[in-house]
Amino acid sequence: MSLLQKTGPATLRAEKVLWRGGRVLSPTSPAATALIAEGDRIVWVGLDDEAPAADQTVDLDGALVTPAFVDSHVHLLGAGASLIGLHLADLPSAAAVLARVASFAASVPADGIVLAGGWDETAWADPTPPAAEEVERAAGGRLVYLSRTCGHTGVAGPRLLAEHPELAALDGFDASGVLTRAAHRAARAVLQTAVPVAQRLITARAALAHAASLGIAAVAEMAIPNAADPLTEAEFQGLIALGAEPDLPAVYGWWGELAAAEKARDLGAHGCGGDLSADGSLGARTAFVREPYRDADTLGAQYLTADDVAAHLLDCHRIGLPAAFHAIGDGAVQSVLDGLDLVEPALGIDAIRHARHRIEHAELLDSALIARMVHHGVHASVQPAFDAAWGGADGMYAARLGRERALAANPLSKLAGVGVPLAFGSDAPVTALDPWGGVRAALLHRNPVSRLPAAAAFSAATRGGWRALGRDDAGALAPSQRANFTVWDLTTGALPDLSDPRTPDPKCSMTVAGGRLVYSRA
């Protein structure tokens, strides 16, 4: 009988389980064919014929077992909506976007809302976004907001603007309906209030179940609170609670509010910040850069000063939480590092390094900025799929920044080479939940100089995620490590060669998170 015939989610209930007859990717036992998990820990790794007694045995049928993935940057509601709701990615034109919106809106009650994202004009022959009036017409007159794929700009229907005149007073408002900055975030939040928390959690559950099917044992949820949506706190607590359910990956929540560490702690957050934005995105031309954009006379948007960053860091250290900042442009990264410099005399470098603060995205960096990240012990939570989607000499980054700066973006090898710890994520729904895709993108970075070797890329997608969460007892298949592992449809004893575009991604057979079977293909 095969592994999947003999084992299913209902049968993995013993406290001490022997997984045998496979190829176990272990740093302590390179020839290992078996492991034992007891509760949420791995207690033994070795050869089949040397295995101690266990309460239950699972035959791996020669399958490869590796550490499970961690997605270090997700938005579960958006990720779930991209799976079971209206999603506008991979469409060839504004007309196609409007057609999909119209088709979806036909099933929505007349007093309902249409809230979606994912459109990307840089992939269209005519890069003109749909007009506000067109969007509202496609939505059948309903309140509507369509976010761009980056999540930093979007198009609001005229009715939304008319019924919420307070949006006009916010930074980033434009009467055309194309909103950025604070106006964009508020418009999205205003519509989100119409969605009950229970419905939001159904959507998030779909994302977590899908993550488990991809070999992901844990995710870092990046909450973006907004005063326009009073349900955000209940939603956030519900997302963390989902991660404690026995059939889902773990959820580590980041509360993205400035200098709100006490609130974050009380809500159950792992850290304060995350998608606490020091800038915006390159696609929206709101990433804060030190030299102007190539295609617009702007440096982007600076949302946080060094003083803001310093105040946030001091607040986090007072409560005992790590901090994280969204910073894409080199100007934003500099602001974060300047803030770290400001607090170093008061906190001491050892305390700063011990906290494992993070920069999310960290796309535009020079050697001096990287050296300062090393000094402060900052972890880089990066998305290799961004380079695959928009990098290179002729991609969207080149259009925004010019060829030279585009090719210098996402310098993964430089970061890893000098000791900046890397953690891979997707930023789903900005790019899809796809951990092997992220590993492949790191191996095939559009600038060969920035590519990572396979072992380093896989480590960043697994152990690196745990290290960035302050968990040194997870991410490796060795005794005393947490039992987070995945069984793949491979019978080789090594990782696949994803640098060859012809090599298919491995398929997940089982995912174990904290000793719990959260996915089985049976």
Please give the residue ranges for each predicted region.
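Divalent metal-binding segments
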Residues: L3, T11-R20, L25-D247, G253, ...
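Short aromatic-centered micro-motifs
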Residues: I36, L276, T511
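Non-cysteine beta-strand/loop elements that form the S-adenosyl-L-methionine
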Residues: H75, H270-T286, V378-A388
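Conserved, mostly hydrophobic/aromatic
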Residues: G157, G215, G280, H326, ...
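His/Asp/Glu-enriched, well-ordered alpha-helical/loop segment
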Residues: I202, L314-A324, G331-H357, A362, ...
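Acidic (Asp/Glu)-rich catalytic clusters
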Residues: G243-A244, A264-D266, M373-H375
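Short, conserved secondary-structure transition motifs
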Residues: L258-E262, E360-L369
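Short, Lys/Arg- and Gly-enriched loop/turn segments at beta-strand edges
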Residues: T492-S499
